[in-house]
UniProtKB/Swiss-Prot annotation:
Superkingdom, natural source: Bacteria
Lineage of producing organism: Bacteria, Bacillati, Bacillota, Clostridia, Eubacteriales
Gene3D superfamilies linked: HUPs (3.40.50.620)
EC nos: 2.7.7.18
Family the entry assigns: Belongs to the NadD family.
Job description of the protein: Catalyzes the reversible adenylation of nicotinate mononucleotide (NaMN) to nicotinic acid adenine dinucleotide (NaAD).
Swiss-Prot/TrEMBL GO biological process terms: NAD biosynthetic process
Molecular function GO labels: ATP binding; nicotinate-nucleotide adenylyltransferase activity
Keywords: ATP-binding, NAD, Nucleotide-binding, Nucleotidyltransferase, Pyridine nucleotide biosynthesis, Transferase
One of the Pfam families matching this protein, by short name: CTP_transf_like
Name of the protein in its database record: Probable nicotinate-nucleotide adenylyltransferase
Biochemical pathway: Cofactor biosynthesis; NAD(+) biosynthesis; deamido-NAD(+) from nicotinate D-ribonucleotide: step 1/1
Enzyme class: transferase
Length: 201
């Protein structure tokens, strides 16, 4: 069976930690492909200011262009409706029903995961992978949440430690506003694109 993963996010901007997570997932889950999906209109971030979708899409495209096992999809940003994870996963599962799908997301989603739309169906469609920038060792709240989901949905959440790189898009945007250096946080072409388009000032 072919294994593929979907890595969703606003990618505002994409940075080295996103790339690191994708490479880690490739190896750990024996993936043939990781599909980056820039978010369109996620319901939990609907009131937050975001860089226009086509610009975020272009940054992701530049960041992954040299890796043949990475691809990008505009499925969410082309949609006029809210970007529900279930709808995205359903789309890819219907396209490739025989593929074993993984969905990769950040630890911050754990706090509201059980309130996601059609969460039962999501667990049926894919293997749920959560990564952390801070590591998972001895985190009591993580252990409790994992047990809770296992009992309620009879599904095991997979955890992946991405603590090697303590980077966030928010940190990058703030550093740019403050006039600080950020080139070491992202692929060179993404950094140049940000400069050329005067982003995050």
């Amino acid at each position: 069976m072919i294994n593929k993963a979907i890595l969703g996010g606003t990618f505002d901007p994409i940075h080295n930690a996103h790339i690191n997570v994708a490479y880690e997932a490739l190896e750990r889950f024996n993936l043939e492909e990781v599909i980056f999906i820039p978010a369109g209109n996620p319901p939990h971030k609907i009131n937050l200011k975001k860089t226009p979708a086509h610009i975020r899409y272009e940054m992701v495209k530049l960041a992954i262009e040299k890796e043949t096992r990475f691809s990008i999809s505009d499925f969410e940003i082309k949609s006029k409706s809210l970007s529900y994870t279930y709808r995205t996963l359903k789309h890819f599962k219907e396209k490739e029903p025989e593929t074993n799908w993984y969905f990769i997301t950040g630890e911050d989603c754990l706090s509201y995961l059980e309130h996601w739309k059609y969460i039962d169906e999501i667990f049926n469609i894919c293997n749920f992978v959560i990564f952390s920038r801070e590591g998972f060792k001895e985190k009591e709240e993580i252990i409790k949440k994992k047990k809770s989901i296992l009992l309620k949905y009879r599904k095991e959440i997979l955890f992946m430690d991405a603590s090697i790189l303590d980077i966030s898009s928010t940190k990058i945007r703030n550093r740019i506003k403050e006039g600080k250096e950020v080139s070491f946080y992202m692929p060179d072409k993404v950094y140049k694109f940000i400069l050329q388009n005067n982003l995050y000032k």
